[in-house]
């Protein structure tokens, strides 16, 4: 079962690569199948009086994301191209449920260390390992676009129609203009 607590938005930061795309195509949005954000300290050992102590050399952050593949999706293709060209991305990971009246999230500039496309008889996934440039930043926003939180809300809704009122497929239907239509009501 896919988790529904977080969504991710990845945006191409490189303006030359991004200008080849619409804003929607340059921003990859997905619900996370899996993910994580790791903050690690690079520790330095200090020996004092025959005992070990530690101090910090640096801090490193890594973000791992697993997304469902959408064949032909221009955002996913641009993501793959940004990896090949070693371009920076902006990433936001948002909580889908509000806390204290706001959506909480994490933002970072990242470079992709690894982009793996994996598939089997059940799954078709992209797994990403990204290294954070310098540091991530926590933040909040009042509202996320409704279509981000519920993408299926954008799907067409079929309304009831009388028999023989239309012809052709749903996508190509046209109202029938025949003079004699039979009443097929029950």
From Swiss-Prot:
Protein name: Putative tail protein
Gene of this entry: orf50
